[in-house]
Swiss-Prot record:
It is found in: Mitochondrion inner membrane. The gene is cox7. This is Cytochrome c oxidase subunit 7. It comes from the Eukaryota. GO terms for molecular function: oxidoreductase activity. Keywords: Membrane, Mitochondrion, Mitochondrion inner membrane, Oxidoreductase, Transmembrane, Transmembrane helix. One of its GO terms (biological process) is mitochondrial electron transport, cytochrome c to oxygen.
Amino acid sequence: MKNTIVQQQRFLQSIHKPTYLQRPGSFALVYPYYAVMAGLGLYSLYASGRVIFGKKDAF
């Protein structure tokens, strides 16, 4: 079995991106997560505004 640690280290250090975006295909996991978190944050602000103005239901 060949040791490929040095080649992997060279690959990862040559890319100037954050660690969580360096691997191929990682954007398929990271960006949907960002979208869900942004949507939940916006919904939370919307529902908080509704409660502040006296409307108990979010819809």
